[in-house]
Amino acid sequence: MKPTTIASLQKCKQDKKRFATITAYDYSFAKLFADEGLNVMLVGDSLGMTVQGHDSTLPVTVADIAYHTASVRRGAPNCLLLADLPFMAYATPEQAFENAATVMRAGANMVKIEGGEWLVETVKMLTERAVPVCGHLGLTPQSVNIFGGYKVQGRGDEAGDQLLSDALALEAAGAQLLVLECVPIELAKRITEALAIPVIGIGAGNVTDGQILVMHDAFGITGGHIPKFAKNFLAETGDIRAAVRQYMAEVESGVYPGEEHSFH
């Protein structure tokens, strides 16, 4: 199978073809996703909650991310694999580069970091040294204590303009992908249209170039609070492989996420 690359996603944006992505944490699920043609995966620091049982992503370490990245890579050798740099792993550009090298050696193709314009020098540091970067704006879970909980971001003109400014700054610094989480659909549309790079949404409506879901949300095995943007595809299909195919089909057609999964 031909490897999926950032160029593959760039072509999807150019062709206005929506694409699905998903989190993965181990060999078995990564292989299953790849076998069904879902070839863009993220080893997210969400593993702190879904795999380790913490109440936030903050306890996750670079070693944790590297371990799970290596497992996923073995299951999906040709996927485009993103890996989060976890909380306090990129406080300085130099620290970011050192930790990015660790997860890249484990098998990642790209690192994802949360934050806006303050990350410009870090993004430049990484991309100039051959480390591809995916930005992450909106509800950035590592900032949960600043936000006072998991809340929609970017509502109102000032907040929306700031997120757009952040997105443009990250792109100008060299970021090649952007994740937008829990923002109003109208703002997601503005940002997606303003950027040349692909934008992946989660809780950002069906107007972004791609979608991502935490796999546990997609299969209805999340404990506790279920996010508004989540959909249990396993409940509809009764089979994990069929659920993966249904998720991909609904993303590609624009059926998911629907109005009931979106914010304004």
Curated annotation (Swiss-Prot):
Residues noted as binding Mg(2+) in the record, renumbered to the chain: D45, D84, E114
Keyword Nucleotide-binding (UniProt): no
EC numbers: 2.1.2.11
Necessary cofactors: Mg(2+)
Protein origin, superkingdom: Bacteria
Binding-site positions, 3-methyl-2-oxobutanoate: D45, S46, D84, K112
Note describing how the cofactor binds: Binds 1 Mg(2+) ion per subunit.
Subcellular compartments: Cytoplasm
Metabolic or biological pathway, per its Swiss-Prot or TrEMBL entry: Cofactor biosynthesis; (R)-pantothenate biosynthesis; (R)-pantoate from 3-methyl-2-oxobutanoate: step 1/2
GO BP annotations, alphabetical order: pantothenate biosynthetic process
GO cellular component: cytoplasm
Catalytic activity: 3-methyl-2-oxobutanoate + (6R)-5,10-methylene-5,6,7,8-tetrahydrofolate + H2O = 2-dehydropantoate + (6S)-5,6,7,8-tetrahydrofolate
InterPro entries: Pantoate_hydroxy_MeTrfase (IPR003700), Pyrv/PenolPyrv_kinase-like_dom (IPR015813), Pyrv_kinase-like_dom_sf (IPR040442)
Keywords, in A-Z order: Cytoplasm, Magnesium, Metal-binding, Pantothenate biosynthesis, Transferase
Role summary: Catalyzes the reversible reaction in which hydroxymethyl group from 5,10-methylenetetrahydrofolate is transferred onto alpha-ketoisovalerate to form ketopantoate.
UniProt name for this protein: 3-methyl-2-oxobutanoate hydroxymethyltransferase
Gene behind the chain: panB
